[in-house]
Amino acid sequence: MARQLRRDDYTVGWVCALPVELAAAQEMLDEEHPDLELDPADNDENLYALASVGGHNVAIVCLPAGRIGNNPAAAVATQIRATFKKIRFGLMVGIGGGVPSAEADARLGDVVASQPHGTFAGVVQYDMGKTTPSGFERTGSLNSPPQILLAAVARVKANELRGRSKLSEHVAKLRASPSFSAARLGLTCCSKQRTVSVRVLPGFTFCPPQQHN
């Protein structure tokens, strides 16, 4: 029987923008926990998926159907912090946007973990910039990720260099799910074995699927 925890046991808030992202997140969990009884006086309209993964207790929530953007995400995050007061940091995990270039060979299926680089904080908000004749010009920036998350990125890189990365195992676990198999997703051309590795570029950590015969 799954453990029944308290609100203060959850230290990570995990926000998904789309139901398919929530479903993928739930497939990767180590243990799912029973729902907690919330006090109606809290006025928390989020619906949480509570679980543990990698030794951390997480509260996962998806944005309301049809509500995508900065304002709904901010409202959801605010409610998480009000309900789970021991949350140390929040993660927005899902589909992101990127522009491939000669320096950043981003492709469909890549997993990208951004990190600070020079004056670049690590994440660019799409409406904090403008297009000029010479290219994209940033007009603002977000805060850098928490130190503990940057330390985790460094650990992932070190594990990759030592051949101890478990990223491929995690991806294989997800692909074994009928809902996320290659055939179900229309990726029938990807018949070769695929592994995941970390490739470091300025300001980014890429984890691209690579094919091996």
Give residue spans per PLM region.
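Intrinsic-disorder/coil detector with helix-boundary
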Residues: M1-N213
